[in-house]
Amino acid sequence: VDVVNASAEEYLRRDGLRFDWIYADPDRRSDKGRKLVRLEDCSPDIVALKPRLKQVSGRLCVKNSPLFDVGEALRLFPDSRVEVVSLGDECKEVVVYDDGTGPLVTATALGRGSFSAAPGETAPPPGRFDPERYGYLVIPDVSLQKARLARIHLAGKADIWSDNSYGFAVEEPEGVLGRTFAVESIEPYDPKRLKRELKGREAEVLKRDFPLAAEELMRRLGLHAGAGLRLAFTKIGNDFWVIRLK
């Protein structure tokens, strides 16, 4: 192992360089300490260095911020594999493997598994939402949500209307990346009625595809943080719903 004290730009100007893989983890902080997301703003500028990196190696791996957009990754590296990595349902990084084996998008939940699909692959839309049908709610792992793979992953296992929403299943699905809860009831979101019924109670509030933050929902409904109830809020089409979980 050779340790080189030089900037990437300076080092890549050297002659005779050739590597099997290049791994880049650009500095994502500005001179003033501000967090950076755009790859072109990071140091070194991997986008500007791409032509030289291609000469030095046919394989490039770039570690990006968890906020980095998958679509932007594929725009910058069209033939790459893009992997969204999560741990404990928290997105940790977006990794680009620019080695000509793509395009492919992968969601990896560490300790749970992975799921891959080609960009643009779609799942058939589910039918009309019928709250009486469903016995289980699926919360797709955040890696699926970030990679926009939730609908494809749950196809045939649960009905889901958006990559940012919940899945609804008649029977408990197996082999899904995410958490599954038995449903007690699904009902229209009626804040006045809910507040009359639930004010002062402890609850865990979950939400996806819903315009209010969990904290704001708790405030409006008079709830306190706790394990007494588990409520999930979502929007499907033009309608808002609350799901009581067992």
Question: What are these language model-derived features?
Answer:
Residues V1-K246:
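SAM-dependent transferase fold signal centered on methyltransferase-like domains
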